[in-house]
Structure formats: C-alpha cells, structure tokens
Amino acid sequence: MAWFRPGETAVRRDVFRGKVWSAQALHVVEDGAEALVVGCLPGADVLAPTTWIEWLLTGDEEARIRALPNLADGSWRLGRWSWRDTAHLQWVPPDTWFSVNAFYDVSDGHRLANWYVNFQRPVHRTDLGFDTFDLLLDLVVAPDLSRWEWKDEDEYAHGRRLGVVSEADHRAVEKARAQAVRMIEERRTPFTREADWRAWRPDPGRPSPSLPAGVLTSGLGPAL
C-alpha cells in the first residue's frame, strides 16, 4: 500500500450502496501503519447532500429530516459546499469502526473546542484518499477528556429502522462504542498525543484543497 505524503490532498468519500453520499478534500498531515491523519480548514472543497446544505444555510429542521429517507431510497442529490467556521484534524485508523476528530475554533486563537468520535465503516483506501460510510452516531468529548456525551442517537435509531444502518453495522458499532470509551478513559492514542494536537497549526500559506475531477466515479471500492 502506498502512503500519502504530508501536504498532499486526500479525499474522504462516504459511499452508500456504491454511490457517493459526500466527498471532502483534506490535507494529509501524516500517514502510517497506525493511522492516516488529515486536516481540514475553512474553504476546503466539499460535495454534500443538498438537504444538509439547505439545513446549514436556513436552519430548517425539515430539510435535515428529509436527508435520511433520501439516503435510504438513493434519491439524494449533491451540491457544492465550502467547509466553514472550524478547522479539524481527523485520525483515521485502519480496520476500525470510528475515526477521531479534533475540532478547533478558528475565531478564538485556534482553540481546541472538542474531540469528536465519528462512528463509521472501516475505511477502504483509494488512489484519491479513502472511502467509508458515516453511521450517524457520534461521541462528543471535552477538550480535557473529562466528560463526553453521545450525539444523534435518535438519528442512528431512525437509520436502523430505514435499513441505512444494517444489523451487522449495529453489532460492530456496539463493540466500537465500548472501545472508544476505553480509549478516552485510558488516554490511548490519539488522546495520548493531546499536547501535539492542541499545538497543531495549519500552514497559512497552503491553499485550500480541492476535489479532483472524477471524484464521483474514480476508483470506487466495494459497495459500502
């Protein structure tokens, strides 16, 4: 397997039943056997479901609610979006049912705002970056790791009812929940690197990454 070099663009694609649900251009920070670490800044190029974009722009909860049925029946449409307001690092290990994100408030001195465990299918690496599928459930963790709370459990349950989250997914997520909490409690990687992650600053001279041509079709792996 070829490693990505720091500074290269890696594309995260969320793929459902062989079709791209979202795509995000990210900067590679480091890559190795333990994990791929990628960064995102305001201005990064994103393809996202139009219902999600509508919700972000208007706050219309009805638009957000429509997203899951559209996902379940394959009728979603994608629109262009630029990442806004926050920067984040994403720690993406192989063969694991979650990634760990560190979100920074760029309006407040690049302060580490929170950790965010995103439950997802194990990644399939591609020439463009990696493919996965967001399983709707998240764990939000305080910057000092002192407390955490589950997020979007109702959405996760609805995804199960609609068949977006399969029973096999659910069984894996139940195990991954316990694994993620143990990592926090035991301050294991990436949380052992808290000081490094707090100190991370992007290169201000580097342009925002863009999505490449063919992002919707190129090198799609097995149906996720």
Task: Give, region by region, the residue ranges found by the protein language model.
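Short acidic-glycine loop/turn motifs at beta-strand connectors
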Residues: D31-E34, S107-D108, V141-S146
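Structured beta-strand/loop patches that form or line metal/cofactor-binding pockets in enzymes
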Residues: S82-L137
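A short, polar/proline- and glycine-enriched secondary-structure boundary/capping micro-motif
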Residues: L47-W52, L128, G159-L162
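Short acidic, glycine-rich loop/turn motifs
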Residues: R13-K19, C40-P42, V106-D108, R121-V123, ...
